[in-house]
Amino acid sequence: MNTGIIDLFDNHVDSIPTILPHQLATLDYLVRTIIDENRSVLLFHIMGSGKTIIALLFALVASRFKKVYILVPNINILKIFNYNMGVAMNLFNDEFIAENIFIHSTTGFYSLNYNDNVINYNGLSRYNNSIFIVDEAHNIFGNNTGELMTVIKNKNKIPFLLLSGSPITNTPNTLGHIIDLMSEETIDFGEIISRGKKVIQTLLNERGVNVLKDLLKGRISYYEMPDKDLPTIRYHGRKFLDTRVVYCHMSKLQERDYMITRRQLCYHEMFDKNMYNVSMAVLGQLNLMNNLDTLFQEQDKELYPNLKINNGVLYGEELVTLNISSKFKYFINRIQTLNGKHFIYFSNSTYGGLVIKYIMLSNGYSEYNGSQGTNPHMINGKPKTFAIVTSKMKSSLEDLLDVYNSPENDDGSQLMFLFSSNIMSESYTLKEVRHIWFMTIPDTFSQYNQILGRSIRKFSYADISEPVNVYLLAAVYSDFNDEVTSLNDYTQDELINVLPFDIKKLLYLKFKTKETNRIYSILQEMSETYSLPPHPSIVKVLLGELVRQFFYNNSRIKYNDSKLLKMVTSVIKNKEDARNYIDDIVNGHFFVSNKVFDKSLLYKYENDIITVPFRLSYEPFVWGVNFRKEYNVVSSP
């Protein structure tokens, strides 16, 4: 990134509509590398650092020269990008061609380019002389989207901007695909990746490191937001390697059915959904069903003496005593004394969703816009509520998040508990979350960071002095109390195989984290910085941000104010051109946010420049139709 741009800002105000200095510095780098040099870039910015706005600002710059195609994982994130495109346009302060920008979900893009599951090669010529931006690039490989991107790269010879907060998902294979997509050479994966018998033994070898450094030199942008504007994280439980884990000791009932499931149903235990299920809760015969939908249709079927299922509804005293779930026993007991909002991650959406719903209802927590809990717990005279986010409710996710993130819900009085499966990706932001729970141990370091990154990010907290509490729950045997202090103690399979499933997953997670961190440090070292005058294509964008910062603190100045002129000439060296720019923003009534007047426009009054507050007003039920194309970004589901 261009550190010369960062040096132009002093005490940047982040609390107003703004482009952050590192975003402008990165934008400069992207314009030079992708547009000027026609080279692909991996934007490896850690979650919460504003990759989306950087990508959209770049798309606006690039739209003057080429067509820009933006691919996002799903329809919900498509909506987020469309909303953020409006934000980016308002901050851009320069010309762009909106008709040249196309935003698609991966499924929508697939339907445009495949006929009967076969790539329409004749149609790919439309992507000549274009730029592709791919959000969450680490997730596109191993499916048709990844295949299509590779074909477009080879056929059209175009550059890619790949966005990722975690370019390694499970193994270095993902990074290998990214290298292949970004470089002009074909990668032989067998040469760069060493494979053992286990996933954790998949490593980027020395040849791979050299290939990485050679092919991606000058193509990596790494950035991690300083944590000075973030709350501290307080991990709960006992020390486990470099973190803390809550040991949830199973009851005899849970341990018995847990062991039956482990022996009878788990041929590849680490990746078997049955172990995810029984580590969360056991449900008797439900554990042994391969088709849960069949059992959901049973009427008054007994799972345990105190637990039955009827047409997919669980009921019975066991939902309160919770011998079926050591994790929920800890969770329910703990939340009674906690204040604030909770975000709870789980991975087994069908089974887990059933368990969560009826345990919560039975223990006095009401479903948001649904059933009321038994003897409901209250907050501010209203029931404490929960919601469960799974892939089955995509259409209502945005509305739910609007409620969860609203200022009125900072205390959780509207919606306190948000349970989410894997549908929630890093593109979503959760605000004012004070408690983060892991009901399922994540598969990868990337996934773990994404879950934390949904909540713990810049601008998500009004008060950063209060910590965020993290609870990593592990279901363990009733007599299990091992101290896990070093990975070196668990290098032999026979030692690992006797461990509880969740503990094994944690160890595998840490083994893979070791390799991930090694590669991330290489990528970080490859990220280049330089100090140059801003690229001509972003001068007006940069000046717009400098002006916003200046007039935040200045409500009224002399027209020939020396500080304003000095600021503008730091970018436009010619004083006459600088004065012309000042004339343009005043006569054009540039929009600013002022600390006294809030939303304001710049005006000339006698020999002064003043900030004039404004408010939009309208008559009820009056519609205005603008026949000019106000918003031309094309999107498809």
From Swiss-Prot:
Helicase C-terminal domain sequence ranges: 327-507
Assembly and binders: Heterodimer of a 70 kDa and a 82 kDa subunit. Part of the early transcription complex composed of ETF, RAP94/OPG109, and the DNA-directed RNA polymerase.
InterPro entries, sorted: DNA/RNA_helicase_DEAH_CS, Helicase/UvrB_N, Helicase_ATP-bd, Helicase_C-like, P-loop_NTPase
Record-annotated Helicase ATP-binding domain positions: 32-185
Top-level class of the enzyme under EC nomenclature: hydrolase
GO cellular component: virion component
Classification via Pfam families: Helicase_C, ResIII
EC assignment: 3.6.4.-
Free-text function comment from the UniProt entry: Acts with RNA polymerase to initiate transcription from early gene promoters. Is recruited by the RPO-associated protein of 94 kDa RAP94/OPG109 to form the early transcription complex, which also contains the core RNA polymerase. ETF heterodimer binds to early gene promoters.
GO MF annotations in UniProt: ATP binding; DNA binding; helicase activity; hydrolase activity
Binding site for ATP: 45-52
Keyword DNA-binding: yes
SMART domains per record: DEXDc, HELICc
Predominant location: virion
UniProt-listed PROSITE patterns: DEAH_ATP_HELICASE, HELICASE_ATP_BIND_1, HELICASE_CTER
UniProt name for this protein: Early transcription factor 70 kDa subunit
Family, similarity comment: Belongs to the helicase family. VETF subfamily.
Residue span of motif DEXH box: 135-138
Species in which this protein is naturally found: Vaccinia virus (strain Tian Tan)
Listed SUPFAM superfamilies: P-loop containing nucleoside triphosphate hydrolases
Gene expressing this chain: OPG118
Keywords (A to Z) from UniProt: Activator, ATP-binding, DNA-binding, Helicase, Hydrolase, Late protein, Nucleotide-binding, Transcription, Transcription regulation, Virion
Compartment annotation: Virion
